[in-house]
Amino acid sequence: MKKSAPGIACLLALPFLLSGCGAVGSKSLSLSVIYAVSSLLAVGILVGYACFSKKLKSWLLMLLVCVTVVNTGYFMLSVSGSLEVALWSNRISYLGSVFLPFTMLMSIMDVCKIKRPKWMIPVLLGVGAIVFLIAASPGILDIYYKEVTLRIVDGVCVLQKVYGPLHSIYLYYLVAYFSCMVAVIMYARHKAHSVSISYAVLLLIATLINIAVWLLEQLVDIEFEFLSVSYIISELFLLGVDILARSLQNQ
């Protein structure tokens, strides 16, 4: 435990350093640089976990993959230069965003030691695919965005959007997943499973924070995707908690 303590402390401290970077929005530092750093960090965390973790957790690994895809999309959008490339970049970011809550729910179910029915994963993946196709429709259909144009703000490409009739479906999708996570944790407590409820709750809190950040971006006109930083913070936090939990188990 003593040997791993410095590494745990560093890992848990990194989110606070990153959160300070997330507030940077001045013209002196291009937002594209922040997106690039977030993407590289996501790749580094993914590779580091895949290569150096003694016991890989498949759903946590998939979560890291999703965050890498999201942040790559954000970076590509910021340097896109044309509406067509920007829309494809937006689709890439949504590809990761749509399946991220799925990996969180699966992780919580694993932590709570709740068996999944065979139909669950295919059905949830199917629902996620439908939501993704709706979110990826701008430029083809006007159901998610009625109108979308490309603007350049302080040298960074951003999409100017007018929301369509099905834009709210993504919010309902997130709320449904969050409700399922709460239900899983409550069920595990009721059944008194021998599990780390506290770890599951931390996963739930990380999900809630990211949903809150997404809602803030929808309600307030902000030219920076704070989720790119929020996801990295969540990754590092969850990895730190995972390392700490394993260290305590090995005592």
Roles of regions detected by a PLM:
Residues 49-73, 91, 125, 160-219:
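Alpha-helical transmembrane segments of multi-pass integral membrane proteins
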Residues 12-17, 36-48, 125-136, 178-183, ...:
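Hydrophobic core of alpha-helical transmembrane segments in multi-pass integral membrane proteins
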Residues 193-251:
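Interfacial "cap-and-anchor" motif at the non-cytosolic start of specific transmembrane alpha-helices
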Residues 15, 19, 44, 99-102, ...:
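Alpha-helical transmembrane segments
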Residues 26-40, 51-140, 171, 227-232:
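Individual alpha-helical transmembrane segments in multi-pass integral membrane proteins
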Residues 50, 75-82, 105, 111, ...:
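Transmembrane helix-loop junctions and nearby membrane-interface residues
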Residues 1-20:
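N-terminal secretory/membrane targeting signals
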Residues 24-38, 133-184, 217, 221-227:
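Extracellular-loop-to-transmembrane junctions of the mid-late helices
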